[in-house]
Structures are given as C-alpha cells and as structure tokens.
Amino acid sequence: MSTGTFVVSQPLNYRGGARVEPADASGTEKAFEPATGRVIATFTCSGEKEVNLAVQNAKAAFKIWSQKSGMERCRILLEAARIIREREDEIATMECINNGKSIFEARLDIDISWQCLEYYAGLAASMAGEHIQLPGGSFGYTRREPLGVCVGIGAWNYPFQIASWKSAPALACGNAMVFKPSPFTPVSALLLAEIYSEAGVPPGLFNVVQGGAATGQFLCQHPDVAKVSFTGSVPTGMKIMEMSAKGIKPVTLELGGKSPLIIFSDCDMNNAVKGALMANFLTQGQVCCNGTRVFVQKEILDKFTEEVVKQTQRIKIGDPLLEDTRMGPLINRPHLERVLGFVKVAKEQGAKVLCGGDIYVPEDPKLKDGYYMRPCVLTNCRDDMTCVKEEIFGPVMSILSFDTEAEVLERANDTTFGLAAGVFTRDIQRAHRVVAELQAGTCFINNYNVSPVELPFGGYKKSGFGRENGRVTIEYYSQLKTVCVEMGDVESAF
C-alpha cells in the first residue's frame, strides 16, 4: 500500500465480533489522510441506540470472560500479542495513513502495543487478594474483582497504541471494553478488535463505536458502564469527569502537558541534544508529555542551541511511508493553522525563530495538499509568553535559559500541568534531587519520551490522574472485596 491509495470500504463500528453499521446516528464525520489531504472515510457517528447495543453486547461478553481463570485470559492475550507482531507492518502502515506519523515511528508504536498485551497477559493470572489473621482463629481475606464494562476514549496521536494501553489491563482483569477512537483516526482500532476476536475473546468483549462528543456523552452517561478511561485535552477531560461523576464512575484521565526539560551545564551534550529532539519532535510534536519548555543553563546555552538547530534542520520531512522520513504531516488543516498561529504569536511577543515554523511543501505532487510544516526552534523566550505557557501540540521547541537549580525548579513547576519532566546531568545526586522536586507524574533522567510498558505513566495536577501501564494499573481496572470470616460464636450487643 502506498500514500494516496487507501480508502475505507468497510463499516467502522465493531460489535459482537464483527464490523457493523451503527443502529442509529448522531452525525457524520470525515477522516483524512494527513499526507495528501484526501478524505479516506465518511462515516456515521454512533447514536444512543448504537452505544447501548455496544454496551449490552459487552455486558454479555463480560459474564463469560470474567468467569475464565487468569491463565485462560493470559493465553488469549498472548495470542493477540502474537498476531499483532505478525501483522506489524500492516498495522503500522494504517497508522501512517490515518495519523501521518513516519513508518519508522509507527512500527515502534506497534511494538509497544504488543509488548503491552504480553505484559498484562503475564499479570492476568497474578491477580490476588490477601489473607488477614484475626483474633480467636477468625480471619479475613480480600478478593480483587473486575469492574464490568469499561469505556476507553482514545486520542488521535497514538490510535492503536492507546487502544492497546487501555484494553490490555482492562481485559487482563476480566473486564469488557467499549472503545471510542478519535473521529480523526477511526481506522486502526478496528484492527485491534479483529485481532482480539481472532485470538479467542468472547464476541462483544471489545467493541468499537465511532463518533465525536455526542457519542462520548452517551458512553459516559450509560448506567451499565463501570469505568471511563480517557486520553485527550484538559477541557474534554473535565467534561468526562463531570459526566462520569453523576453515575459515580471512576475515571482515568491522561490529559495535556507543558512539560519542562532541564539541561544542566554538566550534561552529556550529544545526549542532551538528542533528548531535546525526542522531547519535541516525535509524531510531529503531537505528544502530550513533550518537554516543550527546554531550560538550558546559561554556560552552555549558545552551544546547545547551535547543536539543536543543526540537528533540527536535518530532520527529513515528507511521505510518512518512506523509510527515511522522520517527520510526516500534522493531523489536519485546522490543527496545522493553529500551530502556525502559535509561532506567529511567539514572534509578536519577542521570541526569535531560529529555524522552521513555516509550511513545508514536499516535492512529490501528490503530497502538495498535505499538512506539513518545518520543525521550529524558538529562543529569546520568557516564562510569560503564550508559547511557553500553553500546550501547542506541534513541532515547536521553546528554549529558555537559567542560572541556578533552585531558580529552574521554581520556574519548571510554575504551570497548571504536571504530566512529565526531564533532566540531563552527569551529577547523579542532582538528578535525583531535582526529579524529587519536580511536580510531574512521569520524570526522565538523561532520556526523554521512552515508554516501557512496565512503568506507570500519568500526570499530576491538571494533567490528570490514574495511570496507564505498569502493575499499578491493575488497581484501576479492578475493585477490592473484603470478606470477614467468623470461626467462633457471634458476640451480640442484644
């Protein structure tokens, strides 16, 4: 498959183990190929009736799945992981077409996806409570049990990976899931649904409904939904939390960020420069945990900035399906214009553009209507600038200087966000001292934007709560039952 050739020809909802047209509608959406600007799908958004059918179907599957042993669930999840590995190129290609990221990155995303399924497959059989001895031979014990039907609402920057991150722990714990992808990237979640079915989950255990805000509202307010896990913006996350609260539903929120990356003068310069590029330009800068506020100690500011600009200008932009491309297009035209608008405001507020920040038109004529821009490096930035305070969600790096550790910590924490943070230094004591003070849920030392599935990922403050990945996520997809066992006579007050 090549850029500019794919068109969706099958239904984009998945219910009961098969692709289906929605039973009713709440509008229509168009999905684009960012590389070319072509419409690849016009699809119906799921209405309240379709959402209810998906939830009821998942509820029936839950009754079967939750009764399986952890080892039985483990074997099926391992089979799903094997199929993902086997179909990696196909899935990665679909991610490129619908999302715009390079095939190089997309393959890494799919690797992380199957690793996530393998990880939680291993934990499925380890779910256990504890035994507590009580006086007189009595005792208590706890049971960790599934919640029921969980809802996953995904973002458009990592469509397949986020669907995997949300569904793997949910299914490992014995739950069912109804998943709603972003309407910008509706395609690849269907591949995951088909893979789960092929691996042997009960029909309906992982259903997919398409749509925007109205569909999301139907899901969050459904009385048979036990939990909602959302990845996306802060304003939408607040609405989801409010809707879920009315049904006393627990939520996991992975929201936005404006993360600091602190470069001390004793850093390994080569690694720090690579870390800054990783912190700003993966997936065209459309990553919630990006370290877009790059604080550089004054002693190395000029040298660091020079190297960053040099490396940024070498980034190959173009057709995301070409092996040597390292930056594809942004997700859509309105978002491209929004990001360019941030660069314009930054210049008006006194920032200096050292490279990029403008539209890029590839030589290939089929790409002329794609949503490309050159990655941008800004200097002369101040903490009160819009480009430093607000999440841009594009390939725009803001470089700021600092003098002391105490100063940079105060400035780094001066934000309503708290998703991630990073530090580059050779001083191991300083590294641990600094991350202990950073108000962020995910911190990196001498690296940035790596995602081992063994480690929990999530934020502080307005970046949300709950976690994706790691053993702790089992607790967010299960509930604890306490059982008290009396081995003697009842001591009655009456």
UniProtKB/Swiss-Prot annotation:
Pathway note: Amine and polyamine biosynthesis; carnitine biosynthesis
Subunit structure: Homotetramer.
GO molecular function, one term: aminobutyraldehyde dehydrogenase (NAD+) activity
UniProt EC number: 1.2.1.47, 1.2.1.3, 1.2.1.46, 1.2.1.19
N-acetylserine modified-residue sites: 2
Gene: ALDH9A1
Keyword Ribonucleoprotein: no
Active-site residues annotated for this sequence: 254, 288
pH dependence of activity: Optimum pH is about 9.4 with propionaldehyde as substrate, and 7.5 with 4-aminobutyraldehyde as substrate.
Phenotype upon changing residue 116 to S: In allele ALDH9A1*2
Modified residues (N6-acetyllysine): 30, 298, 303, 344
Presence of the UniProt keyword Oxidoreductase in the record: yes
Reactions catalysed according to its record: 4-(trimethylamino)butanal + NAD(+) + H2O = 4-(trimethylamino)butanoate + NADH + 2 H(+); an aldehyde + NAD(+) + H2O = a carboxylate + NADH + 2 H(+); 4-aminobutanal + NAD(+) + H2O = 4-aminobutanoate + NADH + 2 H(+); formaldehyde + NAD(+) + H2O = formate + NADH + 2 H(+)
Expression sites (tissue/organ): Detected in brain (at protein level). High expression in adult liver, skeletal muscle, and kidney. Low levels in heart, pancreas, lung and brain. Expressed in all regions of the brain. Expression levels are variable in the different brain areas, with the highest levels in the spinal cord and the lowest in the occipital pole.
Annotated Gene Ontology cellular component terms: cytoplasm; cytosol; extracellular exosome; mitochondrion
Broad class of the protein's primary localization: cytoplasm
Protein name: 4-trimethylaminobutyraldehyde dehydrogenase
Compartments it resides in: Cytoplasm, Cytosol; Cytoplasm
